[in-house]
Amino acid sequence: MTRLIAPLIALLLSACGQGLAPEAERPDRPVRVVSLDYCADQYVLKLLDREHILALSPDAARKFSYMRDAAEGLPTVRPTAEDVLILKPDLVVRTYGGGPNASAFFRKAGVPVVDVGWTPDIPSVMANTQRIADELGESERGAAVNAQMQQRLADLRQRTDGQVALYMTPAGVTTGPGSLIHEMIEAAGLTNMQTEPGWRSIPLERLAYEKPDLVAAAFFGSRTNHPDAWSPMKHPVARTQLTKSEVVSLEGAWTSCSGWFLMDAVEAMAEGTER
């Protein structure tokens, strides 16, 4: 054990000291890739061959991970410097894993990093997918993912009926123009009941006399998981929407991480109006 720890300490000290390694260039086609969080896991699992994945995050196979089935059987690693560096990856992929300074640290330690980032709208989701695919050396796979996404969007545009939808969370929060959720509602051929921009409390007064055709419920498997007794979702007017309107339950794996898999949520909302 001592023989293992000593060189690791030396490696970490060299990465943090005066003799920092020069920032490594990203390989054209990385073959020893480590993913530090479950958002990064999705892209690594979708775009890379399994033999090129050195390790995934501990959450890769959890229920809220969209690519959880593909993660089965692959090694995982904690997003700590010592655990990652000892694997000697040729590329690290991350969104938030390892903390805010992780990207700078790994680059200075000589390990190139792909930062997944966040996307505010559907076009940027596709642009981000292609950028990540390019950086992973899998441009064609990224283009294929985007082509499929574009086809699914085109199919939905033919089903537009203008019914009204309201996005609801256990905390009683909804969202309007300017959010990715709003774009998803519109992509499903629906009209968002929330017309004010940004994230806001559900419009209880309006719901007292007007109901949506569809509720997009982001309760992730539970309609009773309220954060506290003061949540607007405790109000009878809000609860009524779950029985008087068509309800589509959105899986957390569909809407988290702002990836191509949000199309599952979009299609579920579109199909909800046809029941």
Segments from the language model and where they lie:
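C-terminal motif of bacterial Sec signal peptides marking the signal peptidase cleavage site
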Residues: 13-15
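Basic- and aromatic-lined ligand-binding clefts that recognize polyanionic substrates
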Residues: 31-44, 140-189
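Structured C-terminal subdomain patch of bacterial secreted/periplasmic proteins
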Residues: 123-134, 143, 160, 220-275
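A short, structured surface patch at a secondary-structure boundary
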Residues: 32-97, 101-102
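Bacterial signal peptide processing site
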Residues: 17-20
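Alpha-helical, coiled-coil/dimerization segments enriched in small aliphatic residues
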Residues: 58-64, 70-73, 174-203
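Proline-aspartate-enriched helix->loop->beta-strand connector
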Residues: 76, 80-94, 201-220
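Sec-dependent signal peptide recognition
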Residues: 1-10
